Regions:
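Short, well-structured N-terminal submotif of metal-dependent ribonuclease cores
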Residues: 1-37, 52-61
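Acidic, PIN/NYN-like endoribonuclease modules and their adjacent C-terminal/linker elements
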Residues: 3, 35, 101, 105-140
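Hydrophobic side chains within alpha-helical segments
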Residues: 10, 16, 39, 44-47, ...
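Active-site-proximal, substrate-binding regions of enzyme catalytic domains
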Residues: 37, 43-83
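Active-site neighborhoods of divalent-metal-dependent phosphate/nucleic-acid chemistry enzymes
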Residues: 72-120
Length: 140
């Protein structure tokens, strides 16, 4: 069993049919962790899907219940904030995503993401410093 950090772009696919849902579900056989920010981000995505008429309120609440029971080690964001802020400034990228990067660096576990904006940003870093540490879900 491998160990990974996963972000919201991966976890939300467990409960909402999206491209790469099967790949995201396959990750559940591994040991997974994420900053506790994941909970708020998933809830917000579910709310947005209700607002866009992509889910009913009942479906969103049911999806939230399933995610709340998911086997993911939630790590307090508080201990990641300084490193995440430093990464956000260095990368000129939102600190929310950098919390996941920070946890990946601290734990030594690769980050798996489907966030194309983050992947594009990291692809422009000097000498591919994130190569192998950040994995595109589509490459799993």
């Amino acid at each position: 069993m491998s160990e990974y950090v996963v972000d919201t772009s991966v976890v939300i696919k467990w409960v909402v049919g999206e491209p790469e849902t099967a790949l995201a579900l396959a990750l559940r056989q591994h040991r997974l962790s994420a900053p506790d920010l994941l909970v708020a981000e998933c809830a917000n995505i579910l709310w947005k899907k209700v607002r866009r008429n992509e889910l009913t309120g009942d479906q969103a609440v049911f999806a939230a219940r399933l995610l709340d029971r998911a086997d993911i080690e939630l790590v307090p964001a508080r201990g990641l904030m300084e490193a995440a802020t430093s990464l956000a400034v260095a990368l000129d990228h939102p600190a929310y995503d950098c919390l996941y990067l920070s946890l990946s660096e601290r734990s030594g576990r690769p980050l798996v993401t489907a966030d194309t904006r983050l992947l594009k940003k990291l692809g422009t870093t000097p000498a591919g410093i994130y190569s192998g540490r950040v994995i595109d879900l589509r490459a799993m």
